């Protein structure tokens, strides 16, 4: 079971600038009597009633700079707008509102099984940005995708397909520069033997595989529950490096992410990539 406590933070975490989205709860002021809690100002019969007691204020864009916390929401509204500012780090002290935030307590309250929804907890650090992914980024990944394709998503056949692929192709493709003359010669040889694959095309060909992983705001935060399509019997968690990129293409930050992939679905057809990835 995932446990996030003070040991989840490296000792030097205060030495830098960090971006977070934090669910910040707040109290709902009793604008109307407790037994008639219609939305203030709405006199229509049957108007929607908010739940009684505390209500969440929603996600906040939070900056952590040199160990201090700042709320960037009043200045920018969203993390996306903040990262597209001219100087996102410089804006922290100029425009951020200093707040008292115990990051260790927020971390401890973040896993779904230990969460108190009336206390702050971490969300995914992005909001309005498109979530893109790069596939077949190294040799092992490329060979695994070829294996998926050759066993047609059948996990029981994966071991035999893996041995077959490695015997024929080998593991030394890392020395080949994608799109080079050597790569094109290898492609011709593989095509002649009937071993060419769309995954090899993006692995050693001229163009990389870059696709939309999911829609904005579909990502979930640390320790949150994830959804896996019930039709899949072979899914993989994939720890990956994630980059925060602004609209000008500048890399502003890095984090770790979990790219859950339905291997049996993707192995049936590359045209099912969206179904295999967006889950």
Regions found by a protein language model. Give the residues of each.
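Active-site microenvironments in enzyme catalytic cores
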Residues: 2-24, 36-37, 54, 90-279
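Gly/serine-rich nucleotide phosphate-binding loop at the start of the catalytic core
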Residues: 13, 17-37, 41, 51-101
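Compositionally biased, low-complexity flexible segments
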Residues: 45-49
């Amino acid at each position: 079971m995932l446990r996030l406590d003070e040991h989840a933070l490296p000792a030097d975490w205060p030495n830098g600038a960090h971006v977070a989205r934090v669910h910040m709860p707040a109290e709902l002021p009793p604008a109307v009597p407790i037994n008639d809690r219609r939305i203030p100002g709405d006199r229509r019969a049957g108007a929607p009633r908010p739940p009684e007691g505390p209500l969440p204020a929603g996600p906040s864009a939070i900056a952590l700079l040199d160990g201090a916390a700042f709320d960037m929401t009043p200045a920018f509204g969203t993390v996306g707008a903040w990262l597209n500012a001219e100087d996102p780090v410089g804006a922290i002290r100029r425009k951020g509102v200093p707040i008292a935030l115990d990051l260790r307590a927020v971390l401890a309250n973040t896993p779904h099984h230990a969460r108190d929804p009336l206390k702050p907890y971490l969300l995914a650090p992005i909001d309005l940005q498109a979530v893109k992914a790069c596939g077949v980024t190294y040799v092992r990944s490329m060979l695994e995708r070829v294996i998926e394709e050759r066993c047609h998503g059948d996990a029981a056949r994966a071991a035999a397909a893996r041995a077959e692929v490695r015997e024929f192709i080998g593991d030394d493709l890392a020395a080949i520069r994608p799109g080079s003359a050597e790569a094109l010669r290898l492609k011709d040889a593989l095509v002649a033997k009937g071993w060419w694959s769309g995954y090899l095309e993006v692995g050693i060909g001229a163009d990389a595989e870059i696709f939309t992983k999911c829609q904005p705001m579909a990502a979930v935060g640390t320790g949150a529950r994830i959804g896996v399509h019930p039709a899949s019997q072979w899914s993989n968690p994939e720890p990956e490096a994630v980059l925060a990129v602004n609209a000008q293409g500048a890399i502003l930050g890095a984090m770790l992410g979990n790219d859950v992939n339905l291997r049996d679905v993707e192995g049936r057809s590359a045209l099912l990539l969206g179904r295999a990835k967006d889950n």
